[in-house]
Amino acid sequence: MPQDPRAPAGDFWTRVRALPTLGLGVSTEYGAAAAPGALDPRALRLAHGCADFLEVGVELSRGLDPAALAWAAEGWPTTYHFLDVNLDDPADLDDGWLSGLRALTAQLRPAWLCGDAGLWHFGRRDRGHMLLLPPILIPEAIAPMAAGLRALRAATGLEVLPENPPGAAFVGPMHLLDFFGQLAEAADTGLLIDCAHLWMFQRARGLHPLEALDRLPLDRVIELHIAGGRPTEHEGLGLIEDDHGIEVLPETWQIAEHIAARSPNLKAVIIECERNSIEAALPLYAECRARLGAHLPRAEAP
């Protein structure tokens, strides 16, 4: 796999200083803005000042939708969230996929790449698969995933931030935060912590919302996700549906406040609310600003 000549040089502590501070943003994925009643990211930014940047969820076989293309045409800040690569599988970083990735990043000009570090597909990659299972939480699973992160960074010239995936059940004895902390160090990279996903893990294991955060290298946390979740039950099993609604659970806020206050390199926070109306989403932005206060990263002037 050829290395991009723009590949970030130096160790993480050198590279992180070159990353821009993006502020408070919104996420989207293909077709989300076209859903009935869904917010328009451009309007959220222009009319309400609530979208410093756009995190674009991308499955290469689908490409960019009109909302993402319109944002990119303005030259506004973005990040690229992959939805179709298993980082621990070298075959996923094939020449065709990397070529498509480079073409889309040339359009979006993202500050970095990010995405859930889990199983996006089982077997051959196929359009619309988007399985998304969490990784098996064992030490042996770390090295292959770290190798994928390093390879993707070298091939694209962009930082790659692994995100903790959602799940109703988690296999393996390790705590999720121990796994991701060790992964970040092995890959010499930063982290994207999804606070709603983390609460799903803690709840599934019967743990306190802040369990093991004292063991996570918080100086590697670059981005946070905050999203609504809906508690539900299936045949006696308590679950949280990761619905990206407007009802953010108290434990999710607790996690976000704790991490934001202790992460000196935090550069971006996303409110995941893409399929809700602007009117429904605005209170979430106000609450996020109030709760994170001085710890909320402020976007750099263009």
Language-model regions: role of each:
Residues 1-103:
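N-terminal pre-domain/capping segments
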Residues 16, 43-49, 63-80, 96-111, ...:
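Acidic (Asp/Glu)-rich catalytic clusters
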Residues 30-32, 58-62, 84-86, 117-121, ...:
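Active-site-proximal loop/turn and secondary-structure-junction residues that shape catalytic pockets
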Residues 54, 113, 194, 224, ...:
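Conserved, mostly hydrophobic/aromatic
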Residues 91-92, 131-142, 201-265:
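Gly/Pro-rich active-site loop or hairpin
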Residues 96-191:
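Active-site acidic/histidine proton-transfer and metal-coordination neighborhood
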Residues 153-236:
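Acidic/histidine-rich catalytic cores of soluble enzymes
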Residues 278-301:
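C-terminal helical cap(s) of enzyme catalytic domains, especially alpha/beta-barrels
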